[in-house]
Amino acid sequence: MREHPSTRVDFRSDTVTQPTAAMRKTMAVAPVGDDVLGDDATVIALQERVATMFGKEAGLFVASGTMANAIALRTHTVPGDEIVCDKTAHIYRYEGGGYAALCGASVALVDGEKGLMTAEQVRNAVRKAEGSGSHYPNGSLVCVENTSNLGGGTCYDLNTLDDISSAAREMGCATHLDGARIFNAAAATGVDVARMCAGYDSVSICFSKGLGAPVGSVLVGSRNFVQNAHRWRKMFGGGWRQAGLLAAACAHALDHHVERLADDHARARTIAEGLNRLPEFTVDMATVQTNMVYVDCRSPAKDIVANLAAHGIDVLDTGAHRVRFVVHLHITDEDVTKLLSVCASQWPVESS
């Protein structure tokens, strides 16, 4: 699948995806209402569908994954609480400090392996105000990110997910799963999303990354949780009117763009294996589990980015000597071949 207006090959992120022609047609004819008044049938249908799919009672359609996470954190916590997450977690690194500004919460960071925590690390990280002489914040929420972006697109195994949620409950903590790319995790592990999230009180699911919708995330949880989350969505300015146009795109993505994620994963692995053959690049193959490839470079990353850009290929530098490639529905086998060909010509194997 290509269906992208640009001739450039864009590996910067799976957020660069644009609606396909079929998705646009679905959006154009979607019945809409006023979601603030609760009568947008397409939004209602999406919320119910996603909640059922994830084994939860209710869902809330919001504008972005960051908004879904912010609402979840605020619903689960009160000011002065502490949130446990991995040191690479998106809620800590890339959401503008919302946990502090919007929730009044602090974070306890876990030094996970490739972005993945263990239950024992979670137990050791949770602090409770009670019994501390009021010295500690109150650890009340454990957040897991699956897949882990900065981990390289890595996935939790089911036993670890279950162990973490059990440990959190033992410590008196709620649990939230940041599932921005949870369908990638499901495709890679073969675990159904409802089973994967069974131990988690809330889950955020993004539709504007690998699934290719233009906008939208759904936050799922218990009916009471979603009722409370609805209030925070309003307070955060997230109420919207004829949102069914966007909900229709998300529903189309569920129908047509989930099974194909395995193709993205296969292409990512081809890229990783090809780059590893070149002395310029090093890829930790243990991290290449889904649609991301983080690459360490001998040369400055900004030079790699500029060189590839001159050949019509866009990538992101994520460190002084690190670049990232993300595969999505607009990337074809031909694009992968072009990338590897350009890299082989620009940074060839040194002759002996």
Residue ranges and their predicted role:
Residues 2-30, 34-298, 302-311, 315-331, ...:
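Conserved PLP-enzyme active-site core in the AAT-like
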